Structures are given as C-alpha cells and as structure tokens.
Amino acid sequence: MKALWAVLVVTLLAGCRADVQPELEMQEPALWQSGQPWELALGRFWDYLRWVQTLSDQVQEELLNSQVTQELTVLMEDTMKEVKAYKNELEEELGPVAEDTKARLSKELQGAQARLRADMEEVRNRLAHYSEEMQVMLGQSPDELRARLGSHLRKLRKRLLRDAEDLQKRLAVYKAGAREGAERGVSAIRERLGSLVEQSRVRAALTGQPLRERAQAWGERLRGRLEEVGGRARDRLDEVREQMEEVRAKVEEQAEAFQARLKGWFEPMMEDMRRQWADLIEKVQLAVGASTPVPSEDH
C-alpha cells in the first residue's frame, strides 16, 4: 500500500513539473519584448543561448570551431551598445531633475549594466572553456562534459534572467524620472506663460483706461518711487550724521588726551624754570647786597 502511494506521489510531481517547466520557459522571453532596441537585442542573445543549450550536433560542431563564442560576442556587444544608447537618450530627458538624483540613478544603472555584461561574458567564457575541454577531453567522456556544461548554463541563464530584470526595472525608474523631469519643465513653462499672459492683460487694461486715470496711476508709481528714494536718502543722511558724531567724539577724545600729555610735559618744565628763576633772583639780590658800601660815620 505504501509503495502504491509512493508511485502516485511521484507520478503527480512529475506531471506538475512537466506542466510548469514549459510555461516558465515560454514566459522568460516576454520580459524584454516591449519593443525597445536593447530588449530586442537581449532577446536575440537569449534565443541563441537557448539553442546552444540544446547541445545538438550542430552546436557541438560550431563550439569546436569557435563560431558559437564569436556569435555570442557579437550579440553581447550589440546588446550593450543598445543599452548605452537608450541610457544616453534618457539622460538627455533628465535635464530638469536634480543633479544628486541624476547621479544616484546613473550610478545604479551603471551597476546593473556591469552585472549584465559580466553574466554574458561568463556564458561566453564557459562555452569557450567547454570547447577546449572537448578538444583535449582530459580523460572525461563527452556525456559527462555535456552534463556539466548543461548544469552551468542553467545556472548562468537564471542569473542572466535575474540581472536582465534588474536592469529593465532600473531603466524603467530612469525613464519615469525623465518623464517627471519633463513634466516639471512643462509646468514651469506653463507657469511662465501664465505670468506673461497676466502681465499682457494688465498692460491692455492700462492702455484702455482714460488718459487721466493712466496719469494718476503713473503719478502714484512715481510718488511711491520718490518716497522710497527719499526714505533711502534720509536713512543715508542719518547714517552720515551718526558717523560724523562718532568722528567728532573721537577727535575730542584724542584732543583731550593730547592736551593732557602736553600739560604733563610742560608743567614740570615751567615749575623747574620758576624755581631756577627764583634762585637766580635770590642770588642776584645777595650779590647786590654784598657789593653796596656801608655809609661812613665821619660824613
């Protein structure tokens, strides 16, 4: 009984695998069939890789003469050239977007490009290595080499599919940013045009007014302008007055300081001169007194 259940389970699982696997294989190419040149080029690379993975006799023959690796190289370069062209096209549309946002998106996109190129190069290099092993065999059977290559190719295809999806998503984000920047630029132009239309409407309204009203309007504008100029002049005059007061105060302060220094210099000098003069007078008086004769008593 247990053996019967085991057989039924194995049969169901095999049937499910048979139903799911072809569906996955059919869904994979639809990821890059939106019509962009780079997606079409990647689709050609993918289709050629699926054909190589069959390892038919023709594939074996072309692998041995390096035709497969040459064809993969051409398809890889075509794909990356189209990716670069599409990226440059989107960069031109990213003009109004902020520079930091543009730099961040560009860096992320370059990383996705590098990963996709590395995947395709690894596929090509793996097939070239298989071709070398087939030529020398190295004591291994062809079936063993084919089985190992098939396992490697399945892993590489999964990685290639994952990185292709990542690149596709990042390009979509890049395109959305370009569209947003373009819409923002159009909005700015629309606002500018609206402002110009409003100004034209005001000019037309002023032109249609009577001459007296227009003169009054211009008079009001001129009066406002004169008041503004007068206010600025008064402010400037006040500033000059304050500066003059500051200069006057500084000059007076410096004059007082200079006067104090002069007084400090001359007062000791005058005091010394007065003292010397007093000494001189005293000496003269003494000298005069000593030289005057005393009157004689005989006379």
From Swiss-Prot:
Question: Which keywords does this chain's UniProt record carry?
Answer: Chylomicron, Endosome, Extracellular matrix, Glycoprotein, HDL, Heparin-binding, Lipid transport, Lipid-binding, Oxidation, Phosphoprotein, Repeat, Secreted, Signal, Transport, VLDL
Query: What positions does the entry give for heparin binding?
Result: 156-159, 219-226
Keyword Secreted part of the UniProt annotation: yes
The entry's cellular-component GO terms read: chylomicron; extracellular exosome; high-density lipoprotein particle; low-density lipoprotein particle; multivesicular body, internal vesicle; very-low-density lipoprotein particle
Where do the segments described as 8 X 22 AA approximate tandem repeats lie?
Answer: 74-245
Q: For this UniProt entry, which residues form the secretion signal?
A: 1-18
What do we know about how this protein assembles, alone or with others? Homotetramer. May interact with ABCA1; functionally associated with ABCA1 in the biogenesis of HDLs. May interact with APP/A4 amyloid-beta peptide; the interaction is extremely stable in vitro but its physiological significance is unclear. May interact with MAPT. May interact with MAP2. In the cerebrospinal fluid, interacts with secreted SORL1. Interacts with PMEL; this allows the loading of PMEL luminal fragment on ILVs to induce fibril nucleation.
The protein here is known as: Apolipoprotein E
Native species of this protein? Heterocephalus glaber (Naked mole rat)
| Gene that this polypeptide is encoded by | APOE
